[in-house]
Design a protein with these regions (language model features):
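Catalytic-loop region of hydrolases
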Residues: 25-111, 124-129, 134-136, 284-288, ...
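Glycine-rich nucleophile elbow surrounding the catalytic serine of serine-hydrolase chemistry
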Residues: 209-219
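Short beta-strand/loop motif that positions the catalytic acidic residue
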Residues: 454-456
């Protein structure tokens, strides 16, 4: 492990800095790159010229630099650090700046970590927080000594927060988000500021993100492989345009008359799938461990729940304990692929969602994370225009996307656009796919010795785990299984939804796993994930796809050691 380093601060350095600052025009701001380390206070006002940034900008500046005292305790402890805030100016004067934060610990481990965003971005990630699905019993990245940074991807969200797509009316802002240009700009500025603070560049640089942040991780290592030693991508929205179109098909299905199931009906569907499929992995524990078999055999039209038919009598909507034919039809649409044969990115379909056994928003569950699950799933209201604030997350997302990124008409009826046959909008959607759907060529990253960890919950109804499988399978077809496993791993987690789950709320020390692979050549095998909500403290193996966890027939059902990863 690299030695921990504290910035040098002798009086001679202060004198040299003063000479450096006075060496040019009185009106010229000081450069971020200096020969000796800067104090936190001296970081304020530093600038980075445009020619030091790998993509076009008009330069960057530090708007604030504040020393933050230590706080917290145990794994959640945050050491003393310099919190730097700044802006990267656009080329287009009408475009928004990229805002970023950079946490620089006083005692540095000589490594850097970039955090990805979420949804449509628009806010800066918490640079003193954890990685996606990070462990609760291990130090935070800042606590490990990392210099941690992230940006809002080049626009500032309004009241809709991560669902605000209005930035798409500006081409530069849209490109910063879609193609990941903001990632490169932010990274280059951060590296120079880290060098200014410590007098050297990082020995190692990693990227971690989930959802949109997972897509950003994959984009970063694909477009700029030389910049990164390793990356962690949780539930990545990798084929962004495909994910949006598949999600929009789901939204349109739920918008059909009588198709949206209320929370009680969603709970009935969940119970029916669990009662049908739970034991497929060898133990009935509330987790569907063999999701593929469940997908193959479960049919809501014929399934039972608590011994009674899940389908309402005659298919009519007769109450909260059953699903009508309209609701069953919508669920089956969500389960099936969306055909997309017109995209210039080369993607041809969205594979559908593992809806059978997924928590799509169960309001009787009183856990700390359930409000997040409900918000990210079907929420409280059916999709309709104008889109309700409590509509499904994906419905608000796709409504915004279509209005501001595709048609650029805020008054457009988004539900009228058929994602499989978009008519006049096909060319625009196809064009957007060329930047939003992350490329699959990771040969440059593999050649430079980079390492990639991917993971996805099998009950994610926002970003489909089937899409991550498709990405992995494409990589296998391009590089061969042996070539891919030389630098990448993909794990699946039964019971885990998108970023949160009351069934199995997965945590994993992915950062240590990545560090050990990159820095110690410790090749990762099966991993252990710990539940913090469903049964707090229970563990399961994280099986490398295509394996799944099967109970061995004896032993503690809440211990990973009682399960084997099998094909």
């Amino acid at each position: 492990m690299p030695n921990r380093t504290a910035p040098a601060t002798p009086s001679l350095i202060s004198l040299l800095l003063l000479v450096t600052a006075c060496g040019g025009s009185d009106d010229a701001p000081p450069s971020a790159v200096v020969a000796v380390p800067l104090s936190c206070a001296e970081m304020a006002g530093r600038t980075v010229p445009a020619d030091q940034i790998g993509l076009p900008t008009t330069g960057a500046r530090v708007t604030a630099a504040v020393t933050v005292a230590p706080s917290g305790s145990g794994a959640a402890a945050r050491p003393e650090h310099c919190l730097v805030s700044g802006e990267i100016a656009p080329v287009d004067p009408t475009a928004p700046s990229i805002r970023f934060n950079l946490a620089l610990p006083t005692v540095w481990n000589q490594k850097a970590l970039m955090l990805g965003g979420g949804g449509l971005d628009g806010t800066v990630p918490n640079v003193v927080g954890n990685v996606s699905a990070g462990p609760t019993d291990q130090p935070l990245p800042i606590g490990r000594g990392y210099a941690v940074f992230g940006s809002d991807s080049g626009h500032q969200a309004g009241p809709l927060a991560s669902l605000d797509a209005s930035f798409g009316l500006n081409d530069e802002a849209l490109h910063n988000y879609n193609s990941g240009d903001a990632l490169k700009k932010t990274r280059d500025v951060a590296m120079l500021l880290i060098q200014a603070r410590y007098g050297q560049k990082p020995v190692r640089s990693y990227f971690s993100g989930g959802s949109t942040g997972g897509r950003e991780a994959l984009t970063a290592i694909q477009r700029w492989p030389a910049d990164w030693d390793g990356a962690i991508a949780w539930y990545p929205a990798r084929a962004g345009m495909v994910s949006i179109l598949g999600g929009h098909r789901m939204s349109r299905a739920l918008a059909q008359p009588g198709a949206y199931p209320n929370a009680a009906k969603r709970e009935a569907l969940f119970k029916s799938a669990v009662q049908t499929c739970d034991a497929f992995d060898g133990v009935s524990d509330g987790i569907i461990g063999h999701q593929d078999r469940c997908n193959a055999v479960f049919d809501p039209s014929t399934a039972l729940v608590d011994g009674a038919p899940l389908r309402c009598p005659g298919g009519a909507d007769t109450g909260d304990t059953c699903l009508s034919d309209a609701q069953i039809t919508a669920m089956k649409v969500i389960n099936t692929p969306t055909n997309l044969n017109y995209l210039a990115s080369g993607e041809t379909q969205h594979p559908g969602y593992n809806i059978w056994g997924a928590d799509t928003g169960i309001y009787t569950w009183n856990t700390p994370v359930q409000p997040t699950v409900n918000f990210l799933a079907f929420n409280r209201s059916a999709p309709v225009l104008p889109m309700p604030a409590d509509a499904p997350y994906i419905s608000i997302y796709t409504d915004q996307w279509i209005k501001y990124h595709v048609t650029r008409d805020p008054g457009y009826n988004s539900l009228s656009l058929d994602p499989e046959n978009p008519g006049a909008w096909a060319s625009r959607i196809s064009f957007l796919s060329t930047t939003l759907d992350a490329k699959t060529d990771l040969s440059g990253f593999a050649a430079r010795g980079g390492r990639l960890l991917m993971a996805h919950g099998l009950n994610d109804v926002l970003v489909s785990s089937r899409s991550t499988r498709a990405y992995y399978n494409t990589l296998v077809s391009q590089m061969g299984l042996q070539g891919l496993r030389g630098f990448a791993r993909y794990y699946e987690v039964p019971g885990y939804n998108h970023a949160a789950s009351s069934v199995f709320n997965a945590t994993w020390d992915s950062l240590t796993t990545l560090e050990n692979w990159v820095e110690k050549a410790t090749v990762p095998g099966e991993q252990i994930t710990r539940d913090t909500v469903g049964v707090p403290g229970r563990t399961r193996p994280m099986c490398e796809y295509p394996k799944w966890p099967q109970y061995k027939g004896s032993g503690d059902v809440n211990a990973a050691a009682s399960f084997a990863c099998v094909n």
